[in-house]
């Protein structure tokens, strides 16, 4: 791969600390309102404490938000785009969506916007927002969705008909960096309608408010320089120094303060009229007498009152720079943009060199979404609990949400699952994000993964915080798996893996592994139980709220995740031990632990049943009641298939370098044979690779037949999360109450976990990626000695590598055009997405309909759904 592109050089300059190319980026959140961080209510009602209607008038404490925005890495100075079509009741400063309680399937953004391009250094970025020319249907979206139930489709913006006559603007926002602190901005507004339409554009610059909460030696200021006809403002900020913002000549220039309108929000008194929502008042009421009075403030916007003819595009240029520039918007401006666009294309081509044109477009937008959703995230639990000077948060907080995480304190750039729907980190999501990040920026991927092991994130007992709604929830421990993936990707592309990174991850994850063992294996039988494991509603009851009847649920997925964790730690230790033989002892530790887990899952002990059902050929959760009675929960879900993912092929070359470990393997096998114990290593020869698998080959074969059965798990677009066999519902009675589950290929029909995700049939990209990686690992050992009919009963036998390839193609097909030019992801709105100005736009949803591939859940989850970019790279490798 050509690593001599300008973008590669920028990354090298940044990570070698020669230049700071990442000081500025798309770090501005898309939604700060309705978050846990901004919630100071006594009952933890985050959605209603600071709702969308307050956001324009109320100062945030822990961050900022806006549309197509940027900030410096600590969110001191922010820039974003605001719009008004002359008809809306509010100035469009931020994206609108429904709260969790408002939506019939939980929270949901109700806007059309797309991440088109982004480079890892953010040297070039492009964003598209589609803004209706008629009044935005705020009330209609809320009212109609509240009428709908869990069994109904969500009412989306396209369903309102507001785009039917193409009466909308395409608003393209582009950024190009001349240098790390010299950002060029271009806002292009195109009228897609058939008649002239007016629009007011407010490129808005503002300063995050610290002075109202923490106090500052000197309040920052934005002020107009050079008199009333000048076209630039200066920023003076004690934390980041001085900047200038240059801009095309506006219709007018407005200033106000980024401070709460106490009168509007709290029925209080304002000491002056310059409040956060002043631009809204001025624009909507067409009264600029106050907003134009001052030539300084902490929030500023040049206003461009445009009239745009049909098909016409008007462009606004701005430049935010650390240094004074002569002719800032002149020919050099266009030259920089032209260079950065070409460099972005060149970088993309090196990363996707073997992809087809269509595949490259999918990858480009997947990378763009991943990079656009890097966000500044600030949350200091102890400060949040006790409040700022002059404030008195309710005492209930000290016993409420996250109150036992007082050591958590961060202000970092983190990868968000979705910058509007999930504008907070989720530990296991982030691990998957990093695997795709590693395709474009190895260093960011490694640093991001390491962050979660830092002492200001990880608790002293080794627990990794889950997500802000409840840091104490438990998510699948996939950090070690991701670390190995990233290490191997870098090794494959550069010829050398980062052993220091691997060691650092290993040492901290050893603490986390111990926490898992101590917390989740209460019976000390190596079968793991209890808690929420990230697959929200996959069980017959909410697993995070305890077990009905006071029993214990021995979870096959919990046990499988721990077995996978064991093997990931073993693989890391093996790699490190090749350079540092002191790690051989850790190899033995994790191998031994894996042996006991494998034995426990397949056969716990004499007189005790395993999780495996011989008659049905599946692993099931087991419910143990207080009276000792136990029975399986016979749900055929990916929980029962996860046992396949715990597999490791240890190369004979590795074993030759580690003689103590090799002899221990032989001893273990001999000892267990002599004592009639469960054989973990089925096939063993001193001169061959060694396969460690949680499930024996016979059971693995049976499970594979279920996976590849199109009447069960194999859908046209990937592996389903629940067997289609459950079209006939499964029901069970526990302690006098009835519980059930059925195949639901689309949205959730339950309120479990807010009801905005569904693991009862849809296709999830991260789990599919994990299975495909698993198939490759098995193939590395068996090669052509193990084949399966694909699909089952097809009569066509493929090896496991080929099967992974074919399933990858099904997943990629979700986003690709079919012979009619339709993308399955757009199943409901196909007609609109064949339109000239929609057809190349791709959304990367949270999960996908198990029958037709339709996108579901969060619409911009290019967090883990960006893994499709990895799949494309892998099938072309």
Model-derived features: positions:
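Short, surface-exposed loop and linker segments with low hydrophobicity and enrichment for Pro/Ser/Thr
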Residues: 73-75
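Transition-metal
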Residues: 64-65
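Acidic, mature catalytic/reactive cores of soluble proteins
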Residues: 1-57, 69, 78, 84-877
């Amino acid at each position: 791969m050509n690593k001599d592109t300008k973008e590669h050089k920028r990354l090298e300059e940044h990570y070698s600390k020669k230049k700071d190319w990442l000081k500025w980026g798309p770090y501005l959140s898309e939604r700060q309102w309705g978050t846990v961080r901004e919630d100071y209510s006594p009952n933890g009602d985050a959605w209603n404490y600071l709702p969308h209607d307050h956001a324009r008038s109320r100062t945030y404490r822990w961050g900022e938000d806006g549309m197509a925005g940027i900030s410096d890495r600590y969110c001191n100075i922010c820039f974003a785009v605001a719009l008004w079509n002359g008809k809306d009741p509010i100035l469009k400063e931020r994206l609108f969506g429904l709260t969790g309680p408002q939506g019939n399937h939980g929270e949901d953004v109700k806007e059309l916007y797309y991440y088109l391009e982004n480079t890892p250094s953010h040297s070039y970025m492009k964003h598209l927002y589609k803004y209706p020319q008629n009044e935005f249907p705020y009330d209609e979206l809320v009212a109609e969705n509240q009428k709908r139930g869990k069994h109904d489709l969500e009412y989306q913006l396209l369903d309102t008909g507001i785009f039917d006559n193409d009466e909308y603007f395409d608003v393209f926002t582009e950024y190009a960096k001349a240098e790390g602190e010299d950002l060029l901005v271009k806002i292009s507004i195109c009228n897609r309608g058939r008649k002239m339409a007016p629009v007011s554009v407010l490129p808005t610059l503002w300063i995050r408010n610290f002075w109202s909460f923490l106090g500052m030696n000197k309040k920052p200021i934005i002020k107009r320089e050079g008199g009333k006809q000048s076209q630039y403002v200066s920023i003076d900020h004690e934390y980041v120094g001085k900047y200038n913002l240059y801009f095309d000549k506006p219709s007018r220039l407005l200033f106000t303060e980024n401070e709460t309108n106490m009168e509007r929000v709290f029925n209080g008194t304002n000491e002056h009229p310059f409040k956060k929502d002043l631009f809204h008042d001025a624009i909507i009421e067409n009264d600029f007498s106050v907003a134009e009075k001052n030539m300084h403030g902490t929030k500023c916007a040049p206003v461009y009152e445009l009239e745009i003819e049909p098909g016409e595009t008007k462009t606004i240029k701005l430049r935010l720079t650390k240094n004074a520039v002569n002719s800032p918007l002149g020919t050099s401006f266009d030259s920089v943009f032209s260079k950065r666009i070409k460099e972005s294309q060149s970088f993309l081509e090196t990363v996707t060199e073997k992809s087809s044109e269509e595949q490259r477009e999918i990858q480009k937008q997947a990378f763009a979404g991943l990079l656009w959703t890097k966000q500044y995230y600030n949350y200091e639990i102890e400060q949040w609990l006790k409040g700022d000077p002059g404030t008195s948060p309710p005492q209930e907080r000290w016993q409420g949400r996250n109150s036992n995480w007082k050591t958590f304190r961060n202000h970092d750039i983190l990868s968000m699952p979705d910058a509007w729907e999930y504008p907070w980190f989720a530990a296991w999501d982030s691990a998957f994000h990093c695997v795709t990040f590693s395709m474009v920026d190895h260093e960011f991927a490694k640093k991001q993964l390491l962050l979660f092991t830092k002492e200001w994130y990880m608790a002293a007992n080794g627990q990794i915080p889950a997500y802000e709604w409840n840091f104490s929830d438990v998510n699948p421990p996939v950090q070690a798996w991701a670390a190995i993936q990233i290490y191997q990707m870098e090794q494959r592309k550069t010829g050398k893996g980062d052993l220091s990174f691997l060691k650092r991850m290993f040492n901290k994850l050893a603490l986390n592994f111990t926490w898992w063992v101590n917390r989740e294996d209460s019976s000390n039988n190596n079968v793991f139980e209890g808690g929420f494991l990230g697959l929200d509603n996959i069980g017959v009851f909410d697993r995070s709220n305890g077990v009905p009847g006071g029993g214990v649920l021995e979870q096959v997925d919990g046990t499988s995740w721990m077995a996978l964790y064991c093997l990931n730690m073993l693989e890391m230790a093996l790699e490190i031990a090749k350079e540092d033989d002191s790690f051989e002892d850790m190899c033995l530790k994790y191998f031994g632990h894996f042996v006991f887990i494998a034995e426990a899952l397949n056969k716990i002990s004499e007189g005790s049943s395993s999780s495996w059902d011989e008659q049905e050929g599946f692993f099931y959760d087991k419910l143990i009641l207080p009276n000792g009675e136990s029975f399986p929960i016979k749900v055929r879900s990916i929980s029962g298939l996860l046992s396949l993912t715990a597999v490791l092929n240890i190369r004979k070359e590795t074993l030759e370098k580690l003689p103590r470990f090799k002899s221990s393997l032989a001893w273990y096998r001999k000892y267990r044979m002599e004592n009639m114990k469960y054989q973990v290593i089925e096939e063993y020869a001193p001169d061959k690779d060694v396969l460690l698998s949680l499930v024996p080959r016979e059971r693995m074969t049976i499970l594979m037949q279920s996976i590849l059965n199109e009447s069960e798990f194999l859908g046209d677009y990937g592996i389903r999360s629940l067997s289609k066999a459950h079209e006939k519902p499964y029901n069970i009675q526990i302690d006098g109450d009835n519980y059930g589950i059925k195949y639901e290929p689309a949205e959730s029909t339950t309120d479990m976990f807010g009801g905005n995700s569904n693991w009862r049939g849809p296709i999830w990209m991260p789990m599919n990626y994990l299975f495909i990686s698993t198939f490759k690992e098995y193939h590395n050992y068996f090669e052509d000695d193990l084949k399966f009919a694909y699909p089952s009963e097809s009569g066509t036998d493929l090896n496991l590598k080929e099967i992974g390839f074919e399933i990858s193609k099904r997943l990629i097909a979700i986003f690709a055009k079919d012979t009619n030019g339709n993308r399955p992801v757009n199943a409901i709105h196909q007609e609109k997405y064949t339109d000239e100005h929609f057809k190349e736009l791709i959304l990367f949803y949270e999960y996908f309909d198990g029958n037709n591939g339709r996108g579901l859940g969060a619409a911009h989850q290019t967090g883990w759904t960006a893994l499709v970019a990895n799949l494309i790279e892998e099938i072309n490798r």
